[in-house]
Amino acid sequence: MKLIIFTGLVLFAIVSLIEAEEESGRVCIPLNGECSKSPDKCCDNINCDCYLRFEKGVQAGRPCFCTEKDVIFERDE
């Protein structure tokens, strides 16, 4: 019984430590990763760029992705 309780406490501590590390900012979003909820978490030398998305003339969201700095994307027609 003590072993089960000890194992549960150890697992809880490990999960808490992982969550604390993610919240502390050590984990960054890689290139082309979505950054809509945390635009300041892109890795070094990467910016969080957002664009408006429309469906049938109505705004349907604002997705954001980590992209290279000083890179400009143009619409291909």
From Swiss-Prot:
Residues 1-20 form the signal peptide. Its main location: secreted. It holds the Pfam family Toxin_35. Residues 21-26 form a propeptide. It comes from Lycosa singoriensis. InterPro entries: Spider_toxin_CSTX_knottin, Spidertoxin. This is U10-lycotoxin-Ls1b. GO terms for cellular component: extracellular region.
